[in-house]
Amino acid sequence: MNDTATSPGIDAVRALERVASGSDLGEAEADALLEAMASAEIAPTLAGGMLIALRCKGECAAEIRGFANAMRRLARRPSVPAGGRYVDIVGTGGDGSGSLNLSTGAALLAAACGAAVVKHGNRSVSSRCGSADVLTALGLPLPLDEQRAGDCLAELGFTFLFAPHYHPAMKHIAPVRAALGVRTVFNILGPLANPAAPPYHVIGAFSERIAALMAETLSGMDIERAFVVHGAEGWDEATPIGPFVCFDVRRGSVTREVRDPADYGLSRC
């Protein structure tokens, strides 16, 4: 462990002072900060202080984008062909609904309909079971290593990237998050840090504010199109319960819409 407060890419103490005073970090600074935390170049107490300061200030899109880019760069890369038209269907969790894992069912259905799905996920956050729990129960041996993940996609049109396996650099950050015990930027980074960098996304968010923030973040990333949704009654899903907000994201643009299940011939429940 390096007990100094600087790394070759960032002066973490100065960055913390700026964030604590209400200033935003730039995308490159956030990228360097995440790499410094992941490599244990800054002390856990300083890393924890930074995460709390960011939450109190309110993370901006550039900061989240920098964190996501660093996570992808440090991740293990699945053996899937570059430039593929892949989609990830995922939710942030944390909506407190205690729901079934709807995003996994949607991902499997999309694959059955011909989409190439590269799903990135973990175990349960707020649902009765997380995507990894569901897929394990269905007989998929997890984690799939880089080659097996690619083979699974080629054979089935679906594969799953188990986050703890694909993000080994996060091992130094996990104890900090556990010690803090509160929501931080990492609770919304998962859907943005898929190591396969799919060009298409469907993401559910636990609040409209977070959905808008994730949409703004994605608009500056290398994507083709993404839908970020927040559902009726606070769900991180688009459901038949009622209308849902949908942020339609393309590179450089975000359009907010309110959609209703009735628009698609579905009765409310």
Regions found by a protein language model. Name each.
Residues M1-G98, C113, C269:
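Acidic, glycine/proline-rich low-complexity segments that act as flexible tails and inter-domain linkers
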Residues N2-D11, R18, D24-L25, R73-R76, ...:
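Glycine-rich anion-binding loops and their surrounding alpha/beta cores
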Residues I42, S127, F206-I210:
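Short, contiguous, pocket-lining structural segments
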Residues L46-A47, V117-H120, V228:
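Short beta-strand segments at enzyme active-site cores
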